Amino acid sequence: MILNLFISKKQYTASLAKKRLKTLIKKKKKFFYQSSYLPQLKNDLLLVIAKYIKIQPNKMSIQIEKRKKNLLILEINITNVK
């Protein structure tokens, strides 16, 4: 009976560690997509959008989220548009 307490705790700990590792890998992948080309993408989009709307570079934010294996969601937020 005492042995069961230790075994179940190990299984719980292993399960928890596995969940944490999956979360860490998921966040790292998300960070990679956001960090690798995001600054250049933001600059390029700013130039294109500035042709049509007067905006300040610091008022624009871009988020990229990977939803599926071959699907990225691009979200652009612009505040104080004039």
Curated annotation (Swiss-Prot):
Keywords: Cell cycle, Cell division. The keyword Cell division applies. Belongs to the MinE family. InterPro entries: MinE (IPR005527), MinE_sf (IPR036707). HAMAP family: MinE. Prevents the cell division inhibition by proteins MinC and MinD at internal division sites while permitting inhibition at polar sites. This ensures cell division at the proper site by restricting the formation of a division septum at the midpoint of the long axis of the cell. The keyword Cell cycle applies. This is Cell division topological specificity factor. GO terms for biological process: cell division; regulation of division septum assembly.
